């Protein structure tokens, strides 16, 4: 079988003379038309530090493709900076960008009959957007992560972007002054790379490595270290080999490999967003996966890594401690990983991990010994109850108690809630409800990092619950429950909550309950009127019409 079986449609035969004429104008010569054409989906952007260094990686991959007798074709994909748009109307476009990225990669690769694609991304939605496209197309592909930012430093402490969000709450509660607030701002982000804790970008890159769609150790490398360039070039070489062997994404992205990814997400203390994104990736790959599968995996897998946001360390520390392969080897040895899954290199997981130690080095405490986990079970709990009959996602790290019952403080937007927090109107024991922020209602399912960070900064992280039909940043921790489904915009129970109602969040019992009589709930439901859409034109209006429930991954196809 030829290496260019797809691109032959545009390079072979007399009838393709015009096609070849165009290709000659972008660098093809007589000897190139029998070579595989490989797309380089480059997410480079100066919008965000996450994507600032991607062009160098794309150029390294491009050169390696040429040396491997392939013809690279580079094209751009967009990015949204979650950190910069956070807390604004702009954040409504973040989850939308996942679909735009997926659609743009699919469009370019399919339109140009490419034989493979190397996708290079950095900020949060780059990863799932690329993988959704890769899974849909089933064209040989590999993902290259742009790398993590190194930690900032101030007063002897490591800083991340979440430090800056939390500093806002510390400032409004008079725990720090304006000078210290400015110093945190100046030191939190020292250079290029994605946000440094086990936030969404590092969670998804780690999961892709575990799934076999990225190279070993690549997901925890620092963006500015030389090994990142080497890894990008090596990824290109591996992809060309996969094209020749016809190793396709759906050979790799299977039910078992997704379970491997979920196991690693639990073990590293990863982001709630991984639930949403893997539901969408599984859908694209035609793999059956439900929100309940995450709860099943949670009960089996301990949290092994002491990583921010609720822990002490960042992704570069994890890299030095042994990286994702060390975590995977521990899971494999205890029957929590499928070692027979194939990877993009053609090797199985078990073969890749063969020489990795069974336990982490004793001179570090980023990765715990198996018999001394941070938590004996996973941290991402799927709750259900009358407030979320389709389910919701709770992150239960960094809290003293996994249960709270308290009066509802109800807000119909993130901005209204944030104003109340900064005005010191939220009290210990309250359960904050932020609604009409779901996939359809927002639209776009904004992340509530600003409110949760402000609560933590004010010292309320352990004593206040927060539930929303929106999302949370990977930098969020505390008694937080997101992805509540059905959402308020479609008449979910969260739309019926009133100020002062009693709400119970119980992560141990996996329960999210509005504590009012059934007849009262039925009366409120009969009275509820659907709101008018917030947008009637443009991409947000289109998205609101197409997007599914969060319980299905907020998919649009």
Curated annotation (Swiss-Prot):
The keyword Magnesium applies. Pathway: Amino-acid biosynthesis; L-isoleucine biosynthesis; L-isoleucine from 2-oxobutanoate: step 3/4; Amino-acid biosynthesis; L-valine biosynthesis; L-valine from pyruvate: step 3/4. Transmembrane segments: none annotated. Pfam families: ILV_EDD_C, ILVD_EDD_N. GO terms for molecular function: 2 iron, 2 sulfur cluster binding; dihydroxy-acid dehydratase activity; magnesium ion binding. The modification N6-carboxylysine is found at residue 125. [2Fe-2S] cluster binds at residues 50, 123, 195. It catalyses: (2R)-2,3-dihydroxy-3-methylbutanoate = 3-methyl-2-oxobutanoate + H2O; (2R,3R)-2,3-dihydroxy-3-methylpentanoate = (S)-3-methyl-2-oxopentanoate + H2O. Its cofactor is [2Fe-2S] cluster; Mg(2+). The keyword Nucleotide-binding does not apply. Binds 1 [2Fe-2S] cluster per subunit. This cluster acts as a Lewis acid cofactor. InterPro entries: DHAD_IlvD/Edd, Dihydro-acid_dehy_C, DihydroxyA_deHydtase, DiOHA_6PGluconate_deHydtase_CS, ILV_EDD_C, ILV_EDD_N, IlvD/EDD_N. The active site is at residue 473. It is an enzyme of class 4 (lyase). Keywords: 2Fe-2S, Amino-acid biosynthesis, Branched-chain amino acid biosynthesis, Iron, Iron-sulfur, Lyase, Magnesium, Metal-binding. Mg(2+) binds at residues 82, 124-125, 447. Its EC number is 4.2.1.9. SUPFAM superfamilies: IlvD/EDD N-terminal domain-like (SSF143975), LeuD/IlvD-like (SSF52016). One of its GO terms (biological process) is L-valine biosynthetic process. Functions in the biosynthesis of branched-chain amino acids. Catalyzes the dehydration of (2R,3R)-2,3-dihydroxy-3-methylpentanoate (2,3-dihydroxy-3-methylvalerate) into 2-oxo-3-methylpentanoate (2-oxo-3-methylvalerate) and of (2R)-2,3-dihydroxy-3-methylbutanoate (2,3-dihydroxyisovalerate) into 2-oxo-3-methylbutanoate (2-oxoisovalerate), the penultimate precursor to L-isoleucine and L-valine, respectively. Belongs to the IlvD/Edd family. Homodimer. This is Dihydroxy-acid dehydratase. It comes from Nitrosospira multiformis (strain ATCC 25196 / NCIMB 11849 / C 71). The gene is ilvD.
